[in-house]
Amino acid sequence: MPARLHARDLMTTELVTLTEDETLADAQRCMARGRIRHLPVVRDGNLVGLITHRDLLAASFSIFAEVDRGEQRRIFSTVRVVELMHRDVVTVPPDLAVTEAARILLENKYGCLPVVDESDLLLGIVTEADFLRLTVQLLE
């Protein structure tokens, strides 16, 4: 293990991503299939947003509280990800120390940090689970 770890050493690089035109139903399916909670939204490989499991839950409860399940599914299949995604996503460069990445996650209560290059090309994502894996490795 390197003496000083960086975001690139910890990030997940096999990513499931969405495009802006995909629907909330697509996001739900991707999250369920991959058992993931964060989906980067990309345009030509560049990060343009992020949608999370919490976003989908909030939309379900606030917008659709009075709507039956069938209608909710219909709406989720027509609403595009771009309408719900976070656009002002905090990102980190691949050479950021993992201690600093952890600090950013903790202080801001984020669940993930997309790792991008200087042109916003999505390289990977660092999640809470990545830090837990690292902790287990260090404790063994």
Residue ranges of predicted features:
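Tandem CBS (Bateman) regulatory domains
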Residues: 1-14, 53-90, 97, 102-106, ...
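The conserved cystathionine-beta-synthase
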Residues: 18-35, 41-43, 91-109, 116, ...
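A glycine-centered beta-loop-beta connector
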Residues: 31-34, 39-55, 105, 113-129
